[in-house]
């Protein structure tokens, strides 16, 4: 069995660094990943978080695409609950038109921040009109697939790229896996957020019963020059859960 390795970068701002330093390091990391043969380079979305420098993965994706030539670049992911599916489709259709065959649209269900930023992002949105997450994702799927848009439609998510962005649903439940399978999207199990091995096996089993696509697993990894350095870095890692 062969494996393809990719990177999900959150653009962390280290102590005594600026956001500009963190973003410059993200660009360098993407270029190094391409040189080393990594398959994908994804950018996360976090709001009102001074330690993380990327609230808008779409903007970073455009910049990274212009600084690389081969590696696939995408979001890991767009927090769809905050946005119009139509506008997300426009953004990623534009990115896909700029770099055909290199753009991934990863979508998440989480807020990507705490309630204060969620309220600010969703100011003026009506929950009844927005619909459920599944309804939003279905709308988005319709906007990014040219075959779903007939010539007679009054509204299209232009430009219509020659190679659409690939759709990925990020999640850690059988419900998310089933939703991705129903839309023929790819699925990413967020083991970096929920590493329960039993849940992973259950979700992967459900996925394989409902989709012929491979499953992607996101994990936390620490890389260093030596095992001792890696162990020292691991001791500094703190994992927080917010309910």
Task: Annotate each predicted stretch with a short phrase.
Residues 1-68:
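N-terminal beta1-alpha1-beta2 module of alpha/beta enzyme domains
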Residues 2, 34-35, 61-70, 96-103, ...:
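Acidic (Asp/Glu)-rich catalytic clusters
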Residues 5-9, 41-43, 73-76, 103-107, ...:
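Hydrophobic faces of well-ordered beta-strands that scaffold small-molecule active sites
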Residues 9-24, 78-86, 161-171, 224:
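Active-site mouth loops of central-metabolism enzymes
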Residues 53-60, 194-207:
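Active-site-adjacent beta->alpha loops and helix N-cap segments on the catalytic face
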Residues 119, 125-156, 198-243:
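An alpha-helical appendage that flanks or caps ligand/catalytic pockets
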Residues 177-193:
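A conserved active-site cap/scaffold subdomain adjacent to cofactor or substrate pockets
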């Amino acid at each position: 069995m062969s494996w393809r390795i990719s990177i999900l970068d959150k653009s962390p701002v280290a102590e005594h660094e600026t956001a500009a330093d963190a973003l410059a390091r993200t660009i360098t990391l993407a270029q190094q990943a391409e040189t080393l043969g990594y398959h994908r380079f994804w950018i996360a979305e976090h709001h009102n978080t001074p330690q993380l420098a990327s609230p808008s993965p779409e903007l970073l994706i455009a910049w990274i695409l212009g600084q690389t030539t081969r590696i696939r670049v995408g979001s890991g992911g767009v927090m769809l609950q905050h946005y119009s599916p139509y506008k997300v489709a426009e953004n990623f259709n534009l990115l896909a038109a700029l770099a055909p065959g290199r753009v991934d649209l990863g979508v998440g269900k989480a807020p990507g921040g705490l309630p204060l930023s969620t309220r600010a992002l969703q100011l003026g949105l009506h929950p009844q009109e927005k619909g459920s997450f599944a309804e939003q994702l279905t709308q988005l799927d319709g906007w990014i697939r040219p075959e779903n848009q007939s010539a007679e439609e009054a509204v299209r998510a232009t430009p219509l790229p020659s190679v659409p962005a690939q759709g990925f649903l990020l999640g850690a439940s059988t419900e998310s896996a089933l939703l991705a399978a129903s839309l023929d999207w790819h699925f990413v199990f967020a083991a970096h957020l929920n590493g329960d091995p039993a849940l992973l096996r259950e979700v992967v089993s459900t996925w394989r019963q409902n989709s012929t696509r491979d499953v992607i697993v996101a994990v936390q990894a620490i890389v260093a020059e030596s095992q001792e350095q890696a162990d020292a870095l691991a001791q500094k890692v703190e994992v927080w859960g917010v309910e």
